[in-house]
Amino acid sequence: MQGQNQQQAYDRGITIFSPDGRLYQVEYAREAVKRGTASIGVRTPEGVVLVVDKQTRSPLLEGSSVEKLHKIDDHVGAASAGHVADARQLVDFARQQSQVERVRYDEPIGVRTLTKSVTDHIQQYTQVGGARPFGVALLIAGVEGGEPRLFETDPSGTSNEWKAVAIGSNRGDIQEFLEDEYDAGLSVDDGIDLALRALNEGREDALSGDGVGVGIVDADTGTYRELAADESQSYIDDIEDAADDSDDDDDEE
């Protein structure tokens, strides 16, 4: 009973480490991320692709109301997994930091600098009593000095730079697929194809243009844009056609 009471004390105290060096509230925040639908980032020489699962809980819910892709600045976009309201708070903070940089230095903020500002903000909420960690992870994609960059943030306030990465539900299977299929020479179109096929891993229902979101940061223009549902659907159709052709070839053999 005493051991159980001690664990409950560590659970309640965000600033208290357990004897084995764990912050339980941060770990619970990571679990909240795992409960969110998946988001995937793929970096290519031509730019960075963000693909998100906008799967809804009800057929009556408008897919356009599901906010998982976010424009931070002209050259930076983000994808989220976890608590939507927490993501909105971090996105607003990132936008403010980006605008401060433009006003102060008259130039766009660096992607690494922006990510560090966001993770520093996140980390503060793991040290202050009376607050809780953010139950969300972000993929921050952008162009810096003509080079595509892709970062992941964690509820602990750490960040990592990736070539390809997934956050949210089914991360393990999706990440394994990305590791097997990723190639450093991918085009943006190939990156979209890879991310959509990875998102399809382990799904019971079929992908649709309304059920996914696709964002692209173009390395040449240094701009972020999001695809319309019909554009996303055309990529999904190409994937399905390629799968059908492969099945036909197998039948002939």
Swiss-Prot record:
InterPro entries recorded: Ntn_hydrolases_N, Proteasome_alpha, Proteasome_alpha-type, Proteasome_asu_arc, Proteasome_asu_N, Proteasome_sua/b
Keyword Signal: no
GO BP term, pick one: proteasomal protein catabolic process
MF term (GO), any: threonine-type endopeptidase activity
Feature: compositional bias, Acidic residues: 237-253
GO terms under cellular component: cytoplasm; proteasome core complex, alpha-subunit complex
Intracellular or extracellular location(s): Cytoplasm
Highest taxon in the source lineage: Archaea
Chain residue ranges for the region called Disordered: 229-253
Modes of activity regulation: The formation of the proteasomal ATPase PAN-20S proteasome complex, via the docking of the C-termini of PAN into the intersubunit pockets in the alpha-rings, triggers opening of the gate for substrate entry. Interconversion between the open-gate and close-gate conformations leads to a dynamic regulation of the 20S proteasome proteolysis activity.
Primary location: cytoplasm
Keywords: Cytoplasm, Proteasome
Family to which this protein belongs: Belongs to the peptidase T1A family.
Protein function: Component of the proteasome core, a large protease complex with broad specificity involved in protein degradation.
Subunit structure and binding partners: The 20S proteasome core is composed of 14 alpha and 14 beta subunits that assemble into four stacked heptameric rings, resulting in a barrel-shaped structure. The two inner rings, each composed of seven catalytic beta subunits, are sandwiched by two outer rings, each composed of seven alpha subunits. The catalytic chamber with the active sites is on the inside of the barrel. Has a gated structure, the ends of the cylinder being occluded by the N-termini of the alpha-subunits. Is capped at one or both ends by the proteasome regulatory ATPase, PAN.
Protein name: Proteasome subunit alpha
Upper classification of the organism: Archaea, Methanobacteriati, Methanobacteriota, Stenosarchaea group, Halobacteria
Gene name, Swiss-Prot/TrEMBL: psmA
